[in-house]
From Swiss-Prot:
Disulfide bonds: none annotated. Pfam families: TK. It catalyses: thymidine + ATP = dTMP + ADP + H(+). Homotetramer. Signal peptide: none annotated. It is found in: Cytoplasm. The active site is at E89 (proton acceptor). The keyword Oxidoreductase does not apply. This is Thymidine kinase. Its EC number is 2.7.1.21.
Amino acid sequence: MYVMKQSGWLEVICGSMFSGKSEELIRRAKRATFAKQEVKIFKPAIDNRYSTSSVVSHNGSSVDGIAVASPKDIITHISERTDVIGIDEVQFFDETIIDIVTQLADKGYRVIVAGLDQDFRGEPFGVVPHLMACAELVTKLQAVCSVCGSPASRTQRLIDGKPASYDDPIILVGAQESYEARCRHHHEVPRLDVGTTLDN
């Protein structure tokens, strides 16, 4: 990573499920802690897969965190002594999070957010694309396709072992029993209305 001459910036860690986003957020948070910096980690209250408060990766790594229902709640937990702010599963927050992280970075905090850049349909997910555009540093991670072993950039949602329909709800918090990492060619999203295609 390049050296910042001024304090205060935004880092985005993104990718599909099982690509190591939370793991990378935890690594950066622990590294900052080793450097004697005060770190505060947050996650949306909706994400309670492994813990109601700690940020936990699929591999089992964890760091203490604070679950918040609203992005505005993050502000109440930050002090002048705070150096680094981490936010996991940022895609589950509403657009308020964009203003919050922008203000925090402008005030001199190092802000690190991690989240899915695509939903299960393979389309841009919530606030993440906007945050990527505003960030000084974007790290896009890839998983391994569960079908062919190629680099995977997409998240496959499975319902009873079958690909979820395009019309299913976007938000459905789960873990490996509900989702798999897939490459472009093995990512399946059945649609009732196919619309325009390139086929003749």
